[in-house]
């Protein structure tokens, strides 16, 4: 068998000399250059200030939610358990992208090694897909709470919640591993300028020096599975929720149910809408400037919405924050 392979290989170069020249001139890429916002010149300094402020708001908001949910026993419910997991995932999700982007806004050298680029894409997609799946699970949690309140303790027991959270994380990172393998198994010859502020799929795969149709098709199928399927599941859940809410006799009960669901639905629409715009289309249709603005939405604006809209405006969370701060204040006075 090895002899046959060697013979075939030698014949290929004998009958097709251009392939030999191509192989000799092939230079594999060892690092990428992240162009980011370099075309904006001096505006980058203003962007640095804005993005740094937003990053600190995201970080402080998520840390506050995680801490309050952990410290206040009244929030030890499935809904807030998943909120805490989502906030944790969002914290790491932004940490993978934003610090490097902030550094690049102030530096001339914007290089990232081949391996670091692959790792950045792996963790970014891992946490992003985990968030998508978590939003789907949270939709199911609201469906179980509103449509089946009597069976809710059984449907969303702590054991079930733990398994669902673990399934989201495992599914997210397995899907990410599949996509990253499809991207970085491609040959990258000479072009190394990534027209983006991080190693995103479309921007990197455009640099491959071979046909990428099969890889792109499989990545598209993965995108459908992690974006369209959970979104449709959420839509069906909310149709059932809406039907149940309309049957609630009291106006206060309907208002409270609508308020809880509306905050979740607003985050879902922004997150899935922006992600679908970027990933559920061929790479050939990638338009860098427009796509970069949309990417900013789901890498910065959506993580900003989660703590502000979904949790900090929630009366239970606000009350819990006051209780936690009140306890700390009383402890200081006592000491």
From Swiss-Prot:
It is found in: Cell membrane. One of its GO terms (molecular function) is olfactory receptor activity. It comes from the Eukaryota. Disulfide bonds join 117-209. GO terms for cellular component: membrane; plasma membrane. The chain crosses the membrane at residues 46-66, 75-95, 120-140, 160-180, 218-237, 258-278, 292-312. Glycans are attached at residue 25. Keywords: Cell membrane, Disulfide bond, G-protein coupled receptor, Glycoprotein, Membrane, Olfaction, Receptor, Sensory transduction, Transducer, Transmembrane, Transmembrane helix. GO terms for biological process: detection of chemical stimulus involved in sensory perception of smell. Pfam families: 7tm_4. It is a multi-pass membrane protein. Its main location: membrane. Residues 67-74, 141-159, 238-257, 313-335 are cytoplasmic. Residues 1-45, 96-119, 181-217, 279-291 are extracellular. InterPro entries: GPCR_Rhodpsn (IPR000276), GPCR_Rhodpsn_7TM (IPR017452), Olfact_rcpt (IPR000725). Odorant receptor. Belongs to the G-protein coupled receptor 1 family. This is Olfactory receptor 10R2. It comes from Homo sapiens.
């Amino acid at each position: 068998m090895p002899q046959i392979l060697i013979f075939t290989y030698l014949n290929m170069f004998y009958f097709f000399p251009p392939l030999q020249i191509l192989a000799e001139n092939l230079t594999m890429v060892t690092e990428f250059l992240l162009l980011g916002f370099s075309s904006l010149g001096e505006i980058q300094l203003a962007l640095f200030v804005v993005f740094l402020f937003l990053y600190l708001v995201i970080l402080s908001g998520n840390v506050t939610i995680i801490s309050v949910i952990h410290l206040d026993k009244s929030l030890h419910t499935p809904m807030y358990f998943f909120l805490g997991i989502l906030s944790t995932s969002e914290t790491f999700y932004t940490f993978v992208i934003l610090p490097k982007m902030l550094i690049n806004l102030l530096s001339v050298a914007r290089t990232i090694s081949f391996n670091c680029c692959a790792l950045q894409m792996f963790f970014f997609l891992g946490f992003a897909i985990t968030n998508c799946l978590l939003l789907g699970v949270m939709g199911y949690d609201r469906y179980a709470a509103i449509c089946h309140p009597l069976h809710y303790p059984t449907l969303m027991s702590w054991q079930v919640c733990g398994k669902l959270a673990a399934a989201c994380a495992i599914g997210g990172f397995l899907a990410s591993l599949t996509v990253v393998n499809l991207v970085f198994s491609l040959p990258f010859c000479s072009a190394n300028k990534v027209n983006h502020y991080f190693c995103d799929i479309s921007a990197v795969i455009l640099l491959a020096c071979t046909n990428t149709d099969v890889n792109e098709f499989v990545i598209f199928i993965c995108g459908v599975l992690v974006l369209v399927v959970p979104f449709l599941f959420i839509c069906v859940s909310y149709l059932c929720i809406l039907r149940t809410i309309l049957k609630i006799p009291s106006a206060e009960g309907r208002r409270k149910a609508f308020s809880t669901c509306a905050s979740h639905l607003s985050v879902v629409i922004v997150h899935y809408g922006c992600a679908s715009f970027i990933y559920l289309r061929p790479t050939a249709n990638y338009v860098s400037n427009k796509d970069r603005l949309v990417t900013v939405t789901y890498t910065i604006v959506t993580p900003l919405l989660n703590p502000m809209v979904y949790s900090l405006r929630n009366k239970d969370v606000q009350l819990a924050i006051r209780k936690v701060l009140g306890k700390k204040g009383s402890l200081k006075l006592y000491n």
